Every structure is written in C-alpha cells, then in structure tokens.
C-alpha cells in the first residue's frame, strides 16, 4: 500500500486540489462456492475492492477536508446489495464499499464534501474476462441473450452526480440493465 500512498502524494503535488475522486478499481476472481475459493483470489479481491479504495481515499480526503469541498464517488455493485451464488467474497467486498461510503458521509457531514456510491448491475466490459482468468469464451457467455449496460452508461452516471448543485448529494445510485431485476436475476433472450 506504500505505492498507493506515493502515487496519491505525487498526484496532489502535481494538480494541487483533487475536486472529484472516483474509486473505480475493482474486480471479481472466480465464481465458486466460498469453501472452494483460491486464497490468492480471495485476498486479491479484498486488497483491490476494499483496502485499495480505502487507502486512496485516506490519501486524498485530507486535502478535501482542508479545502472544505470535494466529491468522492465509490463504485459498488448490485452484488453488494443482492449476493449471488459463487460470489460471496465479491459481494462482501462491494457491500463493504457501500457501508464505508455511508460511514464516510457521516464523518464528513459538517463539510461540503459529497460521498456517492454508484452500484452498477451487469456492464459489458473486460470484468468477466478477469473474473474467469482470461477465459474469453466463458466471459462472453455472461453477456449472451441480454443488452448489458455499457461503460459509457456508468460514465454518464458519474457525470450526472457530479453536476448536481451544492445543496444536492446523491448518496446512492443503483443502475441495472433493462432485463436485470437484481444482481443475478436476469432475463435472457434465447
């Protein structure tokens, strides 16, 4: 985590004030019952999805507090709301993102810092290819038979929450594909 600290400090030195922090790094590894998870996969998800997000925030937040302004946007997932089979660890990490964001909002309530959690559903990116350790065929099946969200949809959501007036704080935004009812309740065309 020392590298995270160094990178964040370099950013603060080069740009001065960070007005918007988007904690977007996240991954899932595997889709298996908890007892069958590879330890490395489990620890990598915790390190990336929870510890990495917290450490970046820890480095950037003090400058926001000093300036009494900023917006922290943390990428959660519908998996953090609706756990599904084979994703106990991933779901837990994304639930942690939501709970951390809520706590951070409470800790900064006396400031003009906003904290938003965006919780996307199924988005067609390289996420599934990473989850299945590079297996492109397995990853492609995740998106078959439905019109998944696209990265641009999530980028537009980020822009939307940042463009609100000072008096408006969007605490949570959940975005799902039209054929998605919960994290893994998805209608697929045959």
Question: Can you say where each PLM-predicted feature lies in the sequence?
Answer:
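The beta1-alpha1 cofactor-binding region of Rossmann-like NAD(H)/NADP(H)-dependent oxidoreductases
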Residues: 1-6, 39
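Active-site loop immediately N-terminal to the catalytic Tyr-X3-Lys motif
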Residues: 35, 84-88
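Active-site-adjacent segment of SDR/Rossmann-fold oxidoreductases
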Residues: 82, 103-113
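Substrate-binding pocket helix/loop in short-chain dehydrogenase/reductase
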Residues: 32-34, 38-43
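Active-site helix of classical SDR
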Residues: 57, 93
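Residue(s) in the substrate-gating loop at a strand-loop-helix junction
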Residues: 77
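C-terminal helical subdomain
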Residues: 117-121, 137-184
């Amino acid at each position: 985590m020392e590298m995270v600290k160094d990178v964040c400090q370099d950013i603060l030195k080069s740009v001065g004030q960070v007005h918007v922090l988007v904690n977007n790094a996240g991954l899932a590894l595997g889709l298996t019952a908890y007892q069958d998870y590879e330890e490395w996969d489990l620890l990598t998800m915790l390190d990336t999805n929870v510890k990495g997000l917290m450490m970046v925030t820890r480095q950037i937040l003090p400058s926001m507090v000093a300036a009494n302004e900023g917006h922290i946007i943390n990428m959660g997932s519908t998996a953090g709301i609706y756990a599904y089979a084979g994703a106990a660890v991933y779901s837990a990490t994304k639930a942690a993102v939501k709970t951390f964001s809520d706590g951070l909002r409470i800790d900064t309530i006396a400031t003009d810092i906003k904290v938003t959690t965006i919780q996307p559903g199924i988005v067609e990116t390289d996420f599934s290819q990473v989850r299945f350790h590079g297996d492109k065929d397995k990853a492609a099946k995740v998106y078959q038979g439905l019109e998944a969200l696209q990265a641009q949809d999530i980028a537009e959501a980020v822009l939307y929450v940042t463009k609100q007036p000072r008096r408006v704080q969007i605490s949570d935004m959940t975005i799902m594909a039209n054929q998605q009812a919960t994290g893994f309740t998805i209608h697929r065309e045959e």
